[in-house]
Amino acid sequence: SQIIHENSLPVGLITATEEQMERVAGELLAITKTVPNFSFQRNTIYLRFCHSDYDKGTALSELCRLEGILKDHVFCAGDHLNDLPMLTLQHAAMLACPSNAIPAVQEAVREAGGHVASLRYADGVAEGILHHGGRAASLS
């Protein structure tokens, strides 16, 4: 593993493989249970340390609060573990993921009544936007 530093402080790490990241994340998960407010966000072989209150979901909700946007008007799409916190009806009313999303993301989107696209990557996100397009337009 390679530790990432900013201003001489460790802020994250990169592993050589996803299997190695699985092991590291498992060890870190145990640490989060004993260290107050410590957490992490990860995506494939990349991991970033963070406060337990910080994730894409809380960031999305705070942005909406600051801008006065109701979650009923929010579309959200993601494909990996770091996206799971925002792919809930707590943060957005319209959820989607591309077909290349990891199984946990596809399951979360389905369980929340969102759209799992038949297309991959950005094309899948565009499909999700079109799927929710009628609803989004009716909210305007």
Which positions does each model-derived feature cover?
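Mg2+-dependent phosphoryl-transfer enzymes with acidic/Ser/Thr/Gly-rich catalytic loops
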Residues: 49-50, 57-140
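Conserved acidic, metal-coordinating active-site core of Asp-based
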Residues: 1-77, 81-90
